[in-house]
UniProtKB/Swiss-Prot annotation:
Name of the gene encoding the protein in the UniProt record: Cul7
Disulfide links within the chain: none
Feature: compositional bias, Acidic residues: 1358-1370
Name of the protein: Cullin-7
Family (UniProt): Belongs to the cullin family.
Sequence segments annotated as region (Disordered): 1321-1371
Cross-link (Glycyl lysine isopeptide (Lys-Gly) (interchain with G-Cter in NEDD8)): K1567
Residues of the CPH domain: 349-422
Amino acid sequence: MVGELRYREFRVPLGPGLHAYPDELIRQRVGHNGHPEYQIRWLILRRGDDGDRDSTVDCKAEHILLWMSDDEIYANCHKMLGENGQVIAPSRESTEAGALDKSVLGEMETDVKSLIQRALRQLEECVGTVPPAPLLHTVHVLSAYASIEPLTGIFKDRRVVNLLMHMLSSPDYQIRWSAGRMIQALSSHDAGTRTQILLSLSQQEAIEKHLDFDSRCALLALFAQATLTEHPMSFEGVQLPQVPGRLLFSLVKRYLHVTFLLDRLNGDAGDQGAQNNFIPEELNVGRGRLELEFSMAMGTLISELVQAMRWDGASSRPESSSSSTFQPRPAQFRPYTQRFRRSRRFRPRASFASFNTYALYVRDTLRPGMRVRMLENYEEIAAGDEGQFRQSNDGVPPAQVLWDSTGHTYWVHWHMLEILGFEEDIEDVIDIEELQELGANGALSIVPPSQRWKPITQLFAEPYVVPEEEDREESENLTQAEWWELLFFIRQLSEAERLHIVDLLQDHLEEERVLDYDMLPELTVPVDLAQDLLLSLPQQLEDSALRDLFSCSVYRKYGPEVLVGHLSYPFVPGAQPNLFGANEESEAKDPPLQSASPALQRLVESLGPEGEVLVELEQALGSEAPQETEVKSCLLQLQEQPQPFLALMRSLDTSASNKTLHLTVLRILMQLVNFPEALLLPWHEAMDACVTCLRSPNTDREVLQELIFFLHRLTTTSRDYAVILNQLGARDAISKVLEKHRGKLELAQELRDMVSKCEKHAHLYRKLTTNILGGCIQMVLGQIEDHRRTHRPIQIPFFDVFLRYLCQGSSEEMKKNRYWEKVEVSSNPQRASRLTDRNPKTYWESSGRAGSHFITLHMRPGVIIRQLTLLVAGEDSSYMPAWVVVCGGNSIKSVNKELNTVNVMPSASRVTLLENLTRFWPIIQIRIKRCQQGGINTRIRGLEVLGPKPTFWPVFREQLCRHTRLFYMVRAQAWSQDIAEDRRSLLHLSSRLNGALRHEQNFAERFLPDMEAAQALSKTCWEALVSPLVQNITSPDEDSTSSLGWLLDQYLGCREAAYNPQSRAAAFSSRVRRLTHLLVHVEPREAAPPVVAIPRSKGRNRIHDWSYLITRGLPSSIMKNLTRCWRSVVEEQMNKFLTASWKDDDFVPRYCERYYVLQKSSSELFGPRAAFLLAMRNGCADAVLRLPFLRAAHVSEQFARHIDQRIQGSRMGGARGMEMLAQLQRCLESVLIFSPLEIATTFEHYYQHYMADRLLSVGSSWLEGAVLEQIGPCFPSRLPQQMLQSLNVSEELQRQFHVYQLQQLDQELLKLEDTEKKIQVAHEDSGREDKSKKEEAIGEAAAVAMAEEEDQGKKEEGEEEGEGEDEEEERYYKGTMPEVCVLVVTPRFWPVASVCQMLNPATCLPAYLRGTINHYTNFYSKSQSRSSLEKEPQRRLQWTWQGRAEVQFGGQILHVSTVQMWLLLHLNNQKEVSVESLQAISELPPDVLHRAIGPLTSSRGPLDLQEQKNVPGGVLKIRDDSEEPRPRRGNVWLIPPQTYLQAEAEEGRNMEKRRNLLNCLVVRILKAHGDEGLHVDRLVYLVLEAWEKGPCPARGLVSSLGRGATCRSSDVLSCILHLLVKGTLRRHDDRPQVLYYAVPVTVMEPHMESLNPGSAGPNPPLTFHTLQIRSRGVPYASCTDNHTFSTFR
């Protein structure tokens, strides 16, 4: 099963060194399906943790709360089950129950009630005075009672809440401190009580007005203590914003409200119905109302959290002038803020006829330094992104641009770019066509975060995870989630406006019942009505709610289309076509205000029209008597649009030369602090500018003094800003300022003391921010889990926005030198800066001895390296590093931890040294130990350090993957349990998996913003759900059969019946195919590493892929399990077939058909995947391996025979020949399984024999080479290939022999010419006679030469002579000699018959053939003497009876063998001849001679065999034509048919004996070497040496082996493979080439002797040859009417 079972509990692996363990049952509830569900706390344990179930677990430990069903509890949490198998319910008994007597407890409750009344009375009496001592004593006694847990119930009275509220709002510090003591005592019992107390206090009306800084901090500290143990989460490496206390308190209120509602939803029915005095009555409602209230509260919390985290400001563009919870929709649609920059000097793409023409224009016009804009989406770059053109070359893509959106260069195509020109040429214009084009390409994104959201359309592969069909009726209405998101804004309207919405819904929906406000959540609202509501809502909502509306998903889906063209909303494109004219008219009527300060006026002008409020504020504050009404009006505008105010404060971060601007701004801010309404402005968002101004060494003293006055005034007014200054490090900055100016700055010391006192509060604020954010993330993960479990939609407003912000930055990469503090080098430090200048043409070059060069990085605190890359260049030759070692240490003196060792290839340019470190190393040292080609010094082109992403994505990804992995592994375990109990439930697995994967697909498309986030979820789902299920269903059970194997076996069994679509077998097969398709094809689109995964770019841009791994395709474990299961099924199927049918005559065709069926089934089940086809072949091979040796030899002989028959049958041509070729092809595909098996040697033996007979009897053809090319791996010794190669060598010898004959002829002709001259001078008459004789000799020699010349053009044996060739031959010779072609073969490659079949040319061939043979023998001897080495033994020819001939008999051409040719030519001189005399002359074995006589005496043959009493064997004579008419002309094939061997005969047993003897030798040699083992090559050599010379089998065994006594290295390797499979030999994975002896073999080892005891050395090698004879004329034939035989070929 998946995971690990310890202490009978299931442990789920969550990551490297992490696993989850079920610890405790927290609560139970009734699920949506009516079945009970149980919340289990899973502890996250690291490697080495004990995890003992009896040990107590600290609740601060990292854990995950997971709701589980009965089946999941039964499969994963055995400890939670009772003896009867039922889940043990959680205990509700108090730990101190029974400790107090009921009477004593009643008396204490009475005392508490009286103490509460007394404290309230005393508190009212001392209002405005110093609290009396009795009041403090009363509160102290109440705190003591509150610490007793059994009395917790009495403190849930509402009067206690009122008492605490009065005490917290008291101006006296002691009373507030006592209230804190009582709250701590009440909340010390359990988290539920603590949460209820905090909730009840925070929900009081206007509590913020009654609480001062200390009281608020007391409640915040209590909340921090309450949430610290609930959601332990670390945000190390992520820069959290500074959140003021008032905003934190508001977040705490929202968070407490949400957690309370969530706790009520997760409670059982009894808890939901119980009344609680601590909480308001409006929250004690039913479940349906609770779900609505929870969704609305969660949406409000997300809205405020996004604003507090300043995610909207970080994601908005700099020119955006709005500050909202989310990036505002108006800021994107206002024409004056969303202008497109372009230059009118360059032509747009729309003015060209084609992309190619435009690409040429851009290529010729564009110059380095010009600005460009992207026109379409391309990999990482989106349409609308701008950048600076750098360079171009001939690569693909050709243009390199530095993009503003990514911060690095990226290569794109010419036609994708629009030229903007140099900066001075660019104008802010709007082009309608361009706007439409960019809108179509996605440049005008309407998603609130500027991070481009690219929905994942294929998280899993189609078409197997098919999305659900969209219901047309549902598409016409809003979903409940969309309606509730719209309802979120309706709830923010006034009472009258809500009633108007209800009336509108009543009119449109035509409901029979009368609607009221409480019935709105249950309505089904049409899309048209929702669009009308979206049209009216912007006019009624406040500014903050309006910006939230523009950011929600329902507005993005339905709002923009309906609002286009309506004048009621000016922010929609096209809504106000005369908007520019209206603005111009208003500007003409009301000229802009001018500031008295020129510096401030420049700031106002840079802000545009929105900056005019700053001028109004300056004028209102600058008058002698500040105009309070005008100032408040300006403050109200700045609260709605705070960008001008933030720009005013951030101007302090400008250059110190702007002294006038700084003083003006500080005086405005100083006056602004005096107004209470000004404290509502977001001062905290720009406080960093003040700290930067403090830290700047160039800041003027006057500016510093004014800044300190302002900060002192601000922190005195609200101590929250002192806390923020502490968080920003202002204390150290003020100390440095005091030290520089020697303490002459007024109020600086006081400001520093005030900031220092807030250290504890700063820590509290940071902890609260972390806890709230971590708690929200946990609640979001809980909602995702509930969404997975129930498949109910997530109905929380802004849920998608929150996830997008959490995932924002997952596709961003940062390569900046801010990850290290400094870089040190071993030599030439003046060039160290070249390592970080990002210029590949510069380099740092070392100077020193080899191996002493290093680069040291001093890392910034907390930076964990994600990737460290070294840039090198191959052109540096010997200066290029070859061996690099990376070490880490805590100090420069202790860099001794080796982190990685890298060998650098000479062709490398980027060398990854480190990836995904898990801890922080202060010092990283790169040591260059060796250079290429033995170089001394080294050159490094650059360093790139990729640190942790400064976003929340790594944290959220880790939590999302952990929860997802735990959920799906628990579910996979439960499903596996069902399958183990009933295999038939495996048929339902495809629908289960399909539903789960479709759910994740839909979730990713709606909520996950980019590819990496979707891939992280996809990879986790795959590893947690599919991988364990595949492992379980492919693991064999008690009967050694896996569940999937049983299912596949059933599929193969009913395959034929499944062709009927109406049968049950068809439905069954369909389910099996759907399951296998899903398991194989549903895979992650990108293989992602465990820590980070970035999509790999293509082509030129691949250099920016920092952390790409592997990886597409199925995980190796899944593929291995599936292929192993399929292999075992195929093996079992084929083993049954082989066992039952190996003796059948039609075994091979049936085997090929079975193989084809399995191959087709593999494609049906798993698609065209090579891994499963290979598994199918390996399964067939495993089945063959299980056969005994003789049966396997029989199988191999049958295949060799079948191939031989199909090759010979294909020669007949026509339809029958094509059918033979098709059968041959199917057989060749099936026989390929022999290639890795021991049986391949046996198959090669038989194939070699049949191929030799085929080549020598009918000749070679193109099919021989094609067959060998396809099944070549099945021949370990490559003997068939060598046989074909020897034919080519023989043809070359034949051509050389032809040249040799011509040379001999030329010499003879010269001699004849000299003789002729001498005879003519001496005797004229006798000279004439000599001349005729010489001409006769010349003609005879020339005939032989031409015959051989004619053979030079022949490439294949058995090819008929062409007409053109005949004409060429007749031109010189008139056919006086038959053509003789000699085929020289070697016994090393060709199977040669015994010596008794050797041909004696002197006695068996006619004289006219013997001459050619003698000439060839002389030629071969001379060629061998010239080409051979001195020490090499001389080769000699031995003529055999093998071969073929063409004999002319009257008008017929008889195709016969060499033996038949000799027999027919023998009858030219005799009318009849006895078989006995023929055998005596030829010395042929009787069976060979009778095999040759059979076809000659058949009905097609020319001979008759007559039996005579006195002549054994009969008499042969030429058949009389009158007795039996025969065809007079044409070709007649009389070559004896092929004879096949029997594997069960003596030869097969000899092969088995040889294998056993080789096994003995292998085992004996390995035994002698013991545990040291032996290299496989050395073992083969020793075995061959022992076979030739050493101790070998007894003489009887050797003689019984016959021709099988020869041994080759392939035979030895085959035996080694056999012994490895049987387990007799073993080898280690790290050294697979070394073999060891494992166990004794079962083969008895015989006594060994020499195979050739009397030989002093090896015999000289023999070379066998055969004949090919051809002739045109028959001058020696009889001229009578009797038919005679003449050798034609």
